[in-house]
Amino acid sequence: MKNFSSVLIGNESLLIQCAERLLQGGDQIHAVVTRHPDIRAWAAERGLRVEAPGEGLADRLAGVSFDWLFSIANLSVIPQAVLDKARLGAINFHDGPLPRHAGLNAPVWAILAREKQHGVTWHMIAGGIDEGDILKQHLFDMAGSETALTLNTRCYEAAIESFAELLSDLHGPGPQRHPQDLSQRTYHRRLDRPDAGALIDLARTGEEIGALVRALDHGHYWNPLSCPKLRIGDRVLLVSAAVPESGHPAAAVGEVLESTMGGLVVGTGSLPVRFTGLSDLEGRPVCPTTVAQAGDRLPLLDAVTARAITQAMTSVADGEARWRSRLQSPEGIDLPLVAAASDQSRWRSTSLTGAKGLEGDELLAAVATWVARVSGKAVFDLAYQDKAVPDAQGCLSNWVPLQVSTSADMPFAEFARGLTPLLEHARRAPAFALDLVARDPQIKALTVPQVGLSLSGEAAGIAGTALTVRVAADGTLSLWYDESRLEEATAATLAQRLERVLETLGDPAARTTPIGRLPIMSATERDQVLYGWNSTRC
């Protein structure tokens, strides 16, 4: 048996399983490249060198000599300079049968395609993504009830079994290479999503609808794509299961045949389908009897609307990773005398003055500076609403969590420069999928920041905020406040403080002043504090 040395790259537990096989067989692992803390901890416990992926990886591995590179559950493209370091070659694990389902999330797309067979593939890294020669492939039949969760589990098991066979070849005669027939290739991109944000088209057959729901069922694990959705009246609800049922009377497409705690039975393009596990977009359960009754007609999804939703969802998909991270770790503020959010907002507004001399991103930075001063926080989230937010029929947010970071000794000009790239990202991806909370177990709830910053023309604050500063196209400002959460006098004081900050920063000479030294009290409030509240009788 010919033992060899290796470097492993990946971010899931499958890497550990394969690494243990290597070590048990007497092979050497010269480095593990990962961003996953559990894998880093395991590697450290095993006494293995650990490197983070990303910029400079080839330089950091400059002194590492190895035979094989294994890419296992790794979703990032490996730099060619790193691949070139492997003396014998680089091998990738793919959770689908190549060339039929190349790219990402192969199990999901296989179920959506209603495939009869699936499998896993170990292949050489060469040419384009997932195009290299096949070394080992395990195929298996798919059950009719397969979900993304069950199919991923079966892929995991097949990966471990086939890796043992791959090692036998590498230890013996060498890799057995089989070129792919790329004419049979289907490639699934990172940003590919089911059509119409996975909103169910009831005109489809019951089998197609069931496949959509099963394909997006990841159990309690992270769902990287979307949740299946059903429009009921003016609400968009999530669906956990959809099973075609015979034995019901003929029904029109969208007609509700049954509404009980056991689910909704609705007419489709073939058999009626029973929808169960209804919840709102944050994953909170919804009883079917509260949203529809037998005899109701659910709205149908026409082709024009479906295309518009697909385009809207696609336009913001690239920003999802950033907003997901922000929603996982919200940085809230707690302004004094502001109550918790209520079910019914009552918006009032007041015009603001003092913004003369400020425009564009500097004006927005001045508003953020005011929030930093009145909240006393150096790091906080603002609900940012751009002037152009795509419409996905209730499937997208109309704001994003803009995380602001500053310090008392940071000059305003420096802060404003640092805020610009954050604003640019928010403009490129001004919304996130509202089912993101239900898809990610690490997001406990959708936390809307207390303060919003809006560039839209809507005559109200951002839903869920207590205060929203609205910047009109001509640069004029208004402060919208929810009077169910704070009194008029409190809003007036906050407005005066914002005007004081704007007035000060309207002078270019003041923009080099550290943020912590910018005045926020108006003359009236200052006199009240110094000579009103603090006055004493002799």
What do the predicted segments below correspond to?
Residues 357-358, 374-465, 487, 511, ...:
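His-Asp-centered acyl/peptidyl-transfer active-site segments
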Residues 2-5, 127-243, 309:
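Active-site-proximal loop/hinge segments within enzyme catalytic domains
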Residues 1-35, 41:
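N-terminal Rossmann-like dinucleotide-binding module
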Residues 378-385, 462-519:
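Extended, hydrophobic beta-loop-alpha segments that form or line the acyl/peptidyl-thioester binding
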Residues 4, 23, 201-316:
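An anion-binding loop in the catalytic cleft
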